[in-house]
């Protein structure tokens, strides 16, 4: 935490502390070329029921016997946790308060300084509190129904490898965004006043289980938005196609990506959304509301965050060809260590403001999949993904699908009632409207806008509130972008 505050202090000094809904468009689909891969994760459709039952039978008993041994249920404490806690106790309260205030947590900053033993005699603290109170007075409550939600898939680092003409190139062109495009999009949104918030800021769950509207207070000119990214598992099919291979915690305790170069060497850096946003927020801390970052929508069939943590890699049963090849290429694969490493990354991410959502274990189309299959799928997510990433009350539906119409969920909706019974209260689909938000006593629902090659090429006018497509478009992207 001390490193974080030290990194942003200079940026804070340069930032001033002063400062009806669209019609719904039919839900769009999210990465169709993942459909066959997700189905293959459980075998062909005609034998899916039998295969799932067999795999559950194979692993149910062994899971209870081995989960402690494989690390899924072990604690997440890291070797340097005590050191981090000691550092936090020694942080400069003025710097802490400055970071809180620049990220719009004026109450937190004021409370922190007023709680210091020497506050009554410290004129610097008193002056800072006065500044924070004055800035807070300029804030207004932002209309929750006018908060947009944008999302990306894994970012392309090397366009030559991604757009090399193979069977996946068209899909990458449609549904992915390059790092160069992403950086320009984020800069444009920052320049326009956008600030990252969370669905948990927009709606809160009360002690009695009901849901209430949240309140987001921002200075004039600031615009809240939600950011998410789908499928941050670095699937096997993406190997060698110009994408990062995993997320890691580097020697400085920061989350970065590993990238395998053409010659097989491994580079570490900002090669996907998580480290890129982390770096951007260090330089522009006012891009984050109360320290919020984005949400990662996670499947589990190929593991998480680039780590092969699904139980199939441990049992060796029901493996797909690319999973078999991975194990053959890595004869020293250690499942327990893989789980431990993934937990370390997830913990570091959450400490920096990132959140996780279910994307279903098998990248399921929730509209087309039976309730029984969804129950089995969610059981796998909770058994093999949640122990690594943590429990979540958010589900971001794959393929842009949904479990109900635009009118809302009702108590006679069996899929909704099931997901609610499993603790999910925040639901997101894909919708190209500028904003689509529903907040009821029972659930929060929000549509997401895809910022990818297809949307930028065919509907640039729909993104003009965020950025000018002509200014962010990567010239190395092949045109025309394939249609749907």
List each language-model region with its residue ranges.
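Sec-dependent N-terminal signal peptides of Gram-positive bacterial secreted proteins and lipoproteins
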Residues: 2-31
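N-terminal, intrinsically disordered, polar/charged segments of Gram-positive cell-envelope systems
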Residues: 26-138
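Amphipathic coiled-coil/heptad-repeat helices and related helical stalk/stem segments
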Residues: 93, 182, 341-342, 412
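C-terminal active-site subregion of NodB/CE4 polysaccharide deacetylases
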Residues: 101, 107-199, 214-219, 223-227, ...
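Metal-dependent polysaccharide deacetylase catalytic core of the NodB/CE4 family, i.e.
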Residues: 145-165, 209-211, 218-225, 233-403
């Amino acid at each position: 935490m001390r490193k974080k505050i030290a990194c942003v202090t200079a940026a804070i000094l340069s930032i001033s502390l002063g400062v009806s809904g669209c019609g719904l468009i039919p839900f769009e689909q999210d990465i169709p070329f993942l459909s066959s891969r997700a189905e293959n994760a459980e075998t062909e459709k005609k034998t899916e029921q039998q295969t799932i039952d067999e795999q559950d039978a194979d692993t149910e008993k062994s899971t209870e016997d081995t989960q402690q041994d494989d690390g899924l249920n072990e604690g997440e404490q890291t070797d340097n946790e005590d050191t981090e806690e000691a550092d936090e106790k020694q942080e400069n309260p003025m710097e802490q308060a400055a970071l809180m205030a620049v990220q719009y947590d004026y109450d937190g900053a004021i409370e922190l300084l007023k709680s210091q033993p020497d506050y009554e005699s410290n004129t610097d603290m008193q002056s800072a509190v006065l500044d924070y109170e004055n800035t807070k007075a300029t804030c207004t409550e932002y209309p929750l129904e006018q908060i947009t939600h944008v999302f990306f898939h894994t970012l392309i680092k090397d366009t030559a490898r991604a757009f090399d003409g193979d069977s996946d190139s068209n899909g990458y062109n449609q549904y992915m965004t390059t790092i160069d495009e992403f950086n320009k999009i984020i800069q444009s949104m920052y320049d326009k006043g956008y600030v990252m918030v969370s669905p948990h800021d927009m709606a809160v769950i009360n002690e009695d289980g009901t849901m209430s509207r949240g309140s987001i207070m921002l200075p004039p000119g600031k615009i809240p938005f939600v950011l998410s990214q789908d499928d941050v598992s670095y699937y096997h099919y993406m190997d060698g196609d110009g994408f990062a291979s995993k997320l890691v915690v580097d020697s400085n305790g920061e989350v970065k990506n590993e990238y395998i170069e053409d010659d097989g060497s491994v580079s570490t850096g900002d090669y996907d959304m998580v480290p890129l946003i982390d770096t951007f927020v260090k330089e522009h801390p006012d891009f984050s509301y109360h320290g919020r970052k984005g949400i990662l929508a996670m499947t589990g069939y190929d593991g998480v965050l680039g780590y092969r943590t699904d139980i199939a890699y441990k049992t060796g049963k029901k493996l797909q060809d690319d999973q078999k090849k991975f194990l053959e290429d890595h004869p020293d694969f250690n499942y327990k260590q893989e789980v431990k490493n993934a937990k370390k990354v997830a913990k570091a991410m959450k400490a920096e403001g990132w959140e996780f959502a279910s994307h279903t274990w098998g990248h399921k189309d929730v509209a087309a999949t039976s309730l029984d299959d969804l129950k089995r799928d969610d059981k796998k997510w909770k058994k093999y993904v949640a122990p690594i990433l943590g429990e979540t009350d958010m589900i971001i539906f794959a393929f842009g699908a949904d479990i109900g119409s635009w009118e809302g969920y009702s108590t006679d909706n069996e899929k909704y009632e099931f997901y609610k019974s499993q603790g999910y209260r925040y639901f997101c689909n894909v919708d190209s409207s500028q904003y689509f938000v529903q907040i009821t006593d029972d659930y929060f629902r929000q549509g997401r806008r895809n910022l990818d090659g297809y949307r930028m090429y065919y509907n640039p006018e729909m993104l003009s509130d965020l950025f000018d497509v002509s200014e962010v478009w990567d010239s190395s992207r092949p045109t025309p972008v394939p249609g749907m």
